[in-house]
Amino acid sequence: MNGISARKRRVLRPYAIRKPKGYLARAPGDLVEVDTLDVRPLPGVTIKHLTARDVVSRWDVVKASTTGTAAAAARFLDTLESRAPFPVSGIQIDGGSEFRGVFETECQKRGIRLFVLPPRSPKLNGHVERAQRTHTEEFYEVTDCCFEIAGLNAALEEWERVYNTVRPHQALGYLTPQEYLECHWPHLRRG
């Protein structure tokens, strides 16, 4: 034996689990898909774009960061909870390193169920993947904002407002996410 193993080690996750087959998101906040996207606006410049999308209402929360660490993703939970007009009870993530460690611990502290996808299955996170395409096409490809993080986050926050309150969504019968929430979930707290 040469000590080399062809088997990959399985990463143990203390809190995150696979989403049960029967788990359905019935109300806003039941399942929020979170993912990161590398945005390269200029040669040699990489920005980590975090997106959270509620699968019921299509409400999005977006933020840019200079790093794709678990600590940055954990800070994004504060942004998500402050900007979403509903409590978040479940988050679905891919197996990226930014969603381990501090992020997982923070979800556990907050009582948020954390579901991790099997490797190489982005189609199972389809809502947030589609949201990232929209943000790329309708924000990053047309924006004139500077790509310094504070200025970019201010522009992203305005884009998020437009996306959630002005831009109609075909999947919601051409309502905005805010109109959808007001029509179908009028009891939710307002952001």
Predicted region positions:
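RNase H-like polynucleotidyl transferase catalytic core
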Residues: 90-95, 109-127, 143-147
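C-terminal domain-tail junction helix/linker
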Residues: 7-24, 101, 110, 121, ...
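Basic nucleic-acid-binding interfaces
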Residues: 67, 113-117, 137
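Mobile-element integrase/transposase regions
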Residues: 1-53, 71-75, 86, 191
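Residues immediately flanking
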Residues: 36, 55, 67, 95
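A structural motif
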Residues: 52, 127-136
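Active-site beta-loop-alpha junctions of metal-dependent nucleic acid enzymes
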Residues: 62-86, 90
